[in-house]
Regions:
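Residue-level marker for isolated small/hydroxyl-bearing positions within beta-strands
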Residues: 21, 67, 110-111, 169
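General structural concept
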Residues: 1-65
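Hydrophobic beta-strand positions that form the internal "hydrophobic ladder"
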Residues: 18, 64, 108-109, 153, ...
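Asp-box/WD-like beta-propeller blade repeats and closely related beta-sheet repeat scaffolds
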Residues: 44-73, 78-102
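Sequence signature of WD/YWTD-type beta-propeller architectures
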Residues: 3-4, 17-20, 24-33, 51, ...
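Per-blade loop-tip surfaces of WD-repeat and WD-like beta-propellers in eukaryotic adaptors/scaffolds
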Residues: 31-43, 71-89, 114-141, 149-152, ...
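Canonical WD40 repeat/beta-propeller blade segments in eukaryotic WD-repeat proteins
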Residues: 3-11, 51-58, 89-106, 138-158, ...
Length: 173
């Protein structure tokens, strides 16, 4: 990838791997191309070609997600594989976040099928009826962020809830 422009680079936590996409101005390695590159081994672990330009990349230790205006795809680094994909209402911001619960279990938050503020939370591997859909706003969501609440909730002895919290925001307020 020497001499190529790259965008949306995400360092993989506790790793020498970086996930990034290309640039629309290039004839090869465009903004529809995604690469997971291991700097320690100096090799490409995974290269993906998508149908639409990539808007966002988020990564955890074992997984990464890429979003376009209408789709989210979740990949595992090892073995390199597509493990989950969702189609959603067109959203220029393509909000998405992921959080690992364990090295083989992950939660995904993304915009839903309704373009007016719907938030969808799902998991991999999926469990029957585990998908949660929330009407989070009256306008499109522009940002989604998970927060691991274990530490916070451990300090609240009367609260028996556990797991990640999720926050949303939009350009409309």
């Amino acid at each position: 990838f020497q001499g190529q422009a790259t965008n949306l680079a995400q360092a993989v936590p506790d790793s020498q791997t970086v996930v990034f996409c290309g640039s629309k101005e290039q004839s090869s390695f465009k903004d529809t191309s995604v690469c997971a590159f291991d700097y320690q081994q100096q090799r490409v672990n995974l290269e993906i070609e998508c149908a639409e330009p990539i808007k966002k990349i988020v990564s955890t230790t074992h997984y990464f997600a890429v979003t376009s205006n209408t789709k989210m795809k979740l990949y595992r680094y090892n073995p390199p594989s597509l493990v989950l994909q969702h189609v959603f209402a067109k959203n220029e911001e393509a909000p998405c976040d992921i959080i690992e619960l364990t090295d083989v279990s992950i939660r995904v938050a993304l915009c839903g099928n309704n373009s007016n503020g719907e938030l969808k939370i799902t998991s991999y591997p999926s469990v029957q009826n585990d998908e949660i859909v929330i009407n989070a706003a009256n306008h499109p969501i522009s940002t989604i962020k998970f927060c691991n609440a274990k530490q916070y909730l451990a300090n609240l002895s009367s609260n028996k809830n556990s797991g990640p919290l999720v926050a949303t925001a939009s350009t409309h307020g």
